[in-house]
């Protein structure tokens, strides 16, 4: 494949559109709440308590938000590691989505930390616990965010005509691409390992030695789903041709990963002797909802004709994305009982608004970047 076969161009157009202004308003509301959180403490802006070490700011903004950021991971794996050049038009939009997903997930951690001013301690060897899986996740996420900045840098350099530096960067970019595949593989699986450690505090419907595998599979699946979702939405909102031919090929991989996940999930329950929990346990409804969404999404992709229809692709990607979201939410929050006693947790309106604001900021920045920087491939690329 040749990376020069596709030309990228800014989409142009007004930035101050209605969607952007709505997102900006949501970000402003979240900003006011965050000011209250940092001046008055966690209790002023959340329902977190001594019985629950984290809430939706970790479960959604970080654990789920980082999976949204796996679009760049899966496309880099396909395009550069497996040398599937047909996916190259999807690279820059996917890397941009990853940059925002991981960058904002990293910042969201600082919102949840009680002593956020000590966050840099993980970088100091005399404070670090080398056997901690949480340390590995933190270092990997921070490093991968920097890697994504470097991977997206060619778009900035191209936009401002800094061709000399861009040419030099291209010579060493393969190192960062390799890191961009290695690091998410490490920390996405380690997000599962973190919950293996909690033992009986996690419902037997989800507690398993296979958690690292399941988290890696959902990261890959959600990465594919985000690529499809983002591509279809961009085509609709920016009046661009649908990228159905390349998305059709991607959908076959989504089908394979989703099918593997479902088979392994049920096999794991059978091997552990917990299959009866799916109808009788206290959280069985959440498990059934998670699996129903996953199975519905993959069944929709089985007919080959559906893989060539943008509506079916979008619906399937949406179902699989929500299934991945629910699986991670089940593991990190719904199926997790961290303390014995009269402790309960349900997110406050302020917590929810902060989370909404984080995703609104991601959308607003995406709108600015695709309009001002060469992110999207030209509708009629030149071949040479």
Where are each of the predicted segments found?
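Membrane helical hairpin/interfacial module
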Residues: 52-117
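N-terminal signal-anchor module of multipass membrane proteins
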Residues: 1-71, 75, 363
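Aromatic-anchored segments of alpha-helical transmembrane domains
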Residues: 103-104, 184-186, 261-264, 320-329
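Alpha-helical transmembrane segments of multi-pass membrane proteins
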Residues: 23-43, 107-111, 182-192, 366, ...
């Amino acid at each position: 494949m040749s990376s020069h076969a596709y030309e990228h161009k800014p989409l142009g157009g007004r930035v101050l559109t209605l969607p952007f202004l709505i997102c900006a308003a949501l970000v402003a509301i979240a900003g006011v709440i965050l000011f209250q959180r940092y001046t008055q403490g966690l209790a002023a802006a959340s329902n977190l308590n001594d019985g629950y070490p984290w809430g939706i700011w970790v479960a959604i903004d970080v654990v789920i938000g980082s999976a949204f950021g796996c679009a760049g991971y899966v496309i880099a794996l396909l395009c550069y590691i497996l040398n599937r050049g047909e996916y190259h038009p999807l690279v820059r939009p996917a890397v941009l989505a990853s940059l925002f997903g991981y960058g904002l997930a990293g910042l969201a951690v600082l919102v949840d930390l009680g002593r956020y001013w000590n966050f840099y301690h993980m970088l100091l060897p005399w404070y670090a616990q080398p056997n901690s899986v949480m340390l590995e996740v933190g270092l990997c996420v921070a490093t991968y965010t920097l890697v994504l900045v470097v991977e997206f840098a060619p778009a900035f350099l191209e936009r401002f005509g800094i061709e000399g530096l861009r040419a030099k960067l291209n010579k060493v970019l393969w190192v960062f691409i390799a890191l961009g595949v290695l690091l998410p593989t490490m920390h996405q699986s380690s997000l599962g390992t973190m919950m293996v450690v909690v033992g009986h505090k996690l419902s037997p419907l989800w507690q398993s030695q296979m958690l690292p595998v399941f988290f890696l599979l959902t990261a890959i699946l959600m990465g594919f789903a985000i690529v499809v979702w983002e591509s279809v939405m961009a085509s609709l909102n920016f009046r661009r041709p649908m990228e159905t031919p390349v998305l059709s090929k991607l959908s076959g991989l989504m089908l394979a990963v989703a099918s593997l996940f479902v088979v392994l999930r049920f096999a794991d329950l059978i091997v552990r002797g917990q299959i009866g929990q799916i109808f009788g346990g206290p959280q069985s409804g959440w498990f059934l909802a998670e699996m129903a969404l996953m199975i519905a999404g993959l069944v929709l992709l089985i007919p080959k004709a559906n893989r060539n229809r943008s509506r079916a692709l979008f619906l399937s990607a949406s179902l699989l994305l929500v299934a991945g979201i629910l699986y991670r939410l089940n593991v990190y929050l719904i199926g997790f009982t961290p303390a014995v006693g009269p402790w309960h947790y349900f997110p406050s309106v302020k917590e929810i608004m902060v989370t909404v604001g984080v995703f609104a900021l991601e959308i607003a920045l995406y709108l600015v970047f695709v309009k001002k920087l060469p992110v999207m491939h030209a509708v009629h690329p030149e071949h040479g």
